Amino acid sequence: MNDNKLIAEFMDLKSTGLSIYKESDYKYHTSWDWLMPVVEKIDEVSDENTLFKIEYNRAFVEDIENYYIFIDVTTSSRLEATYKAVVEFIKNNNLKTI
């Protein structure tokens, strides 16, 4: 999954022969144990102008200065909603650093 690779890069994991994980090993989309450290890092890198919020059956990233990013998730899975919000946050964060 390309989104798992995106998350791994955000977490500074390298998909090289030197890494203990291969891309196919990334479990961000299926495991809270993998995903929660990402949520914690997002909380650390967020500034006073960014709000990262996840609600059951809905997740969104709010950039107070510029715009809102809403991710509508039609699922009863909190893991999936969180995963999609994390991916959108990272994509938005990457655009800001360009």
Where are these regions (language model features)?
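Glycine-rich anion-binding surface patch
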Residues: 1-98
